[in-house]
Amino acid sequence: MVKLTTWLKKIGWGETITQRIFCFYIYCILFGSLLLFLPIALQDNYQKVVSYGIDWQGKRFEQKTDYNFLDALFLSTSAFSDTGLSTVVVSKTYSIFGQIVLAVLLQLGGIGFVVIAFLAWRLFNFHKKEQYSFYEKLMLQSERGGSKLGNTSEMILVSIIFLFIVELIYGFLYGILFYFIPGFEPANLFADHAKVSTQLKALVVDSNQTIAAFNDINKAFQAGFFHSLSAVNNAGIDLIGGSSFVPYRNGLGIIIQWLTISQIIFGGIGYPCLFDGFEAIKKKIKYGRHTKHQFSLFTKLTVITNIVVILLFFTLLLMVEFIASDSLTNTIVNFSDEKKSLINTQLQSQSNQAIHASVFGNNPNASRVMQLFFMVISSRSAGFSVFPVASEIQTTKIIIALAMFIGASPSSTAGGIRTTTLAVIFLALVAKFKGQKEVKAFKRSIDQTTVIDAFLVLIISLIAVLLTAVLLPLSMEQPVSFIDALFETTSAFGTVGLSSGATVNIALDPNRNTFNFLALCLLMVMGQVGVSSSVLTFVRKHPKANSYSYPKEAVKIG
């Protein structure tokens, strides 16, 4: 009986800090699932909209199917992990109550459940001088803290206040922009014809119908504040429609893109970096501009790695887009007469250049460059899309998948293996090639345990993502390529939310394969918690210590 009680305590609460945080997350997801499964959370009684838009003939379509608890669990996991993958069109499936539940889950997952509890405790005990315990400090550090325990609480308070202010200001800005900028519903460029590839079928042009938020003050600010909350938490869920930010891919929509980019960076850079920046500004104000702030190794590695990764992937996407013969730009410019006969009848008589402008706007090349830059930033963890991902060629999908796999920074709202992991692995390889015994960066030596952990994170992440990508298509009725399956699993692990269409296929799968739902949910939680913390969940509080050691012997490898 005692053993059973002990086991139940371990399952329900956990022994270690990591186990308890993991349990908090699971309970929040399950509770959110129950709320999203209530009839009050849905617009239509247990029906979900899986696709919505305008077809190539200009007719509005809406595809519905049954809504079940797996959908609620998937959306709750996606929202709490700040991923954005969805089996439904959120704005057409959930009621105001359901959208509020999603917003709360986004905020809880982005800021952190333990951090929210800490803020609530500070709010209701502001008049007391009571100090929180060493254990509570460890809980905060484990979820959103940096490497130093002493300044964890101050760092979290500063970062949260800053992010809340950003959410409010940007919410008002988005509301104004959504109200005044006429975002048009995207219409399919091609007919659903057997001769047209999946890539070309996904191409869109603007229809003559605006989105619901345009000239509607209530819907504009509702969508604005929801988007602000989603963007700063790097979630990728929106209330615009079924095509993410495609209505704002050109023209004045670029203003919204730049605002979103800045929020994604604020949310994904990590609390330690935000606090470091705050400390630097505070010192400049207090002691003058001649004072030099000593930035932490974490901040230096994070900022430099982020810049390098963004520039690298942006350059790769530009090269593929403007050099590859089968890229979207070159494909449209070189449309054959056979292809043109299958497109929207209103565009058939136009030149290829005019059709190209219809897809990419009045400044096609500039718009396409901006779209690719937005996709690079968004693919780091956010998941907003200004172009249908399914229309991209396989090479582009692989590049975006690599960016999603890396993710953004630790102690942030982002997922993936994290930028610091990549930086440590790169520095370790450089040290090995130079014959150095220590891994060094900015006049600091990185602990050997950290180096080993970085390689473990990489290996475990690769195994989890690749294994799921191999198994995912096997149980689906509709054919899905390995690249698309890999894109989907990487998106889940990186808590990004970009989709090549596989998630919709899962939602439409008549077999209702539970494995696909749960596998992606598991990857989303792993990406949110972090691989290191996920592995530590299974570590005992007091591991059995060996009182002996064996002789060492070299083993030939490679």
Swiss-Prot record:
Entry's Gene Ontology BP terms: potassium ion transmembrane transport
Which is one GO molecular function term here? potassium ion transmembrane transporter activity
Q: What is this protein called?
A: Uncharacterized cation transporter MG322
Q: Where in the cell is it found?
A: Cell membrane
**Keywords assigned by UniProt, alphabetized:** Cell membrane, Ion transport, Membrane, Transmembrane, Transmembrane helix, Transport
> InterPro entries, per this entry?
Cat_transpt
Q: What is its main location?
A: membrane
Q: Which Pfam families match?
A: TrkH
> Membrane topology type, per the record?
Multi-pass membrane protein
| Recorded family membership | Belongs to the TrkH potassium transport family.
Say if the entry is tagged with keyword Chaperone: no
Query: Where are the bilayer-spanning segments?
Result: 21-41, 69-89, 100-120, 160-180, 220-240, 251-271, 303-323, 386-406, 413-433, 454-474, 479-499, 519-539
Q: Name one GO cellular component term.
A: plasma membrane
